[in-house]
């Protein structure tokens, strides 16, 4: 809009309080229809001309710029006389136009402040209008801000079904407990039978005797050692399952933890080691059976050796089943 004679060239619409002010103070809604306004210095002529315009809204936010201060009767430079000497109609039109612009700015400020104080910006209006990919994930509503100004974290993209996970943990846990118990039973029986493999053979009239023990066969020593290791390992795993049950309410830990991965590796290693030693002991027992030693009183030696090797094979089967259960559970959970 054009400037009147003698006005400061720097004053324009951008210099009005609605564009220039950065601090909002207390809102005063005061009618100036009577020519009275708090803090304003108006001369009689200005009061008369000012009363011809509509009522204005005063926003208490600090000093006004030169152009607005001039409309309230304050001097604004050497052009004051020239403005007062202008025609009454032109000056009245200019003053009313500026007051109208100021009224609009003040009312916009007052409406915005009232809206913010009444919580209009906390409504869900904009959340409902959100489009997919803009401001919300998949068009869902964004969470409202907290009281202290911190924005709440967005909702999780995917939540694992807790009920189904608990059922799977209980199912796999029951299977693992049964397999661990079977490993302990068969390894204990195998090492007990192998440890009792001792026999003394006496000749006629006890002129001579011959002692035989499992320590004389290397493969028997190997299978006995693996039975002890697997038995201790199964006992430790069984105790850890019960500790996990008492602490977290489930028999198995998460397959993504280090303990679960180590358990899977140890199951695989011990299973292969046990089946290897059991196979070697089975070969030795077969060779002893083919000879002439398994006759008479020596039959018990061959039977005990074969029984101990058989128990080791059963223990291997249950240990391999445990490793398979852990692998299936790992693939089932990570593949969801």
From Swiss-Prot:
Bilayer topology: Multi-pass membrane protein
Keywords per UniProt: Cell membrane, Membrane, Transmembrane, Transmembrane helix
Segments crossing the lipid bilayer: 171-191, 223-243, 262-282, 308-328
Location(s), subcellular: Cell membrane
Residues in compartment: Extracellular: 192-222, 283-307
Topological domain spans for side Cytoplasmic: 1-170, 244-261, 329-336
Record carries keyword Membrane: yes
One cellular-component annotation, GO: plasma membrane
The protein's assembly and partners: Homodimer and heterodimers.
Similarity comment: family membership: Belongs to the Casparian strip membrane proteins (CASP) family.
Protein name, per record: CASP-like protein UU1
